[in-house]
Amino acid sequence: MKAYPLEACGLISGPTIGSEADVVDEFHPCVNMAGSARVYTIDPKDHLRIEREVENRDNEVIGVVHSHTHSEPFPSPTDVGQAPDPNWHYIIVSLKRESPETRCYRIIDGDIAEETLQILN
């Protein structure tokens, strides 16, 4: 990830939200306003721009992707506290080891549930 050693972040978009099998059409890299290796903050300007772009294609933002540079791919207390939408998918890429590890979660009212993540291409 280009942002390393800082946390990288971005939004994902697709045609549906809230179904059992949401499909991600696009990854939208964002600036990490926190400039940190431990936390991320998506630039509100990036978020608004991406929301408008995907709505023009009848898609919507369906989640966020970010890296954990020094920890496992599991939501931190900060991640849980920042989770803005219970319908979103939260994809975390751990860079703790030589080979990155990616996992996906839903975060609803502070409860964390892992989801199956299938990468097609």
Residue ranges and their predicted role:
Residues M1-V61, H70-N121:
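Conserved beta-strand-loop surface patch within small alpha/beta domains used
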Residues S67:
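Short, well-ordered beta-to-alpha junction loops that form the rim of enzyme active sites
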